[in-house]
Amino acid sequence: PKLISKIKFLAGHSLGEFSALVAADSISFEDSLNLVTQRAKFMQEAVPLGKGGIAAIIGLPLTIINDTCKKITTINNDLLVSPANLNSPNQTVISGTKKGIDLAINQLKEQGAKMAVSLPMSVPAHCSLMIEASEKFALLLENLNLKEPSIPIIQNVTAQNHYQVEEIKDNLSKHLYSPVKWLDTILLLKSQKIKTILECGPGKV
């Protein structure tokens, strides 16, 4: 209780946003399990297994990564790729079709990336390939018993804190095809004079 009373904001990276909502008493643990299960199902259905992917890019600014992805995507639909996780000034995750990811990795290495490597995930989260999945998820969210969070939630889509239930639901559906603005989230916390961040997660990512 003493720790909770000192918490000013909650945020979760990508899927972690659901953990933040549970911690804020906005949704129940049981509802969150159902949501993430259905969310994963919709996302996997949106892109055939082996056709999508993601990659981590280290050592290049977002402007170069964004421009490269845009140029690749204009070639044809099989080469769709875009920034997905905006993690830090020098670390971005890109998402899209496998062919688009492979081409982007090669081009970004040529432009000086310290590291450009595919990650072991077949679902290209946080890109436009997930729009159909987002529409299905939005229908599921309509009937969700979501409450106003007890602690402000900084959502990935906007990197702003939200209280309104309908805003939170809308952002959760957009979340599937929108980039995770994690750098902006950290900068917002800094602007609010937050000096201590408690990180909880199942792994080392």
Task: Describe each region flagged by the PLM.
Residues P1-A11, L60, I94:
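Helix-rich "cap/lid" substructures immediately adjacent to catalytic or cofactor-binding pockets
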Residues P1-L3, A40, L176-Q192:
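Phosphate/ATP-binding catalytic cores across multiple sugar-kinase/actin-like superfamilies
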Residues K2, L21-I27, Q192:
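Alpha-helix C-terminal capping segments
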Residues K8-G12, G16, A20, S28:
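Gly/Ala-rich beta-loop-alpha elbow adjacent to hydrolase catalytic centers
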Residues L15, T97, C200-P202:
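Glycine-rich beta-strand-to-loop/alpha-helix junction loops that act as flexible
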Residues A24-S178:
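Alpha/beta catalytic cores of group-transfer enzymes, especially the acyltransferase/condensing modules
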Residues K114, H126, K181-V205:
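Conserved catalytic block of serine-dependent lipid acyl chemistry
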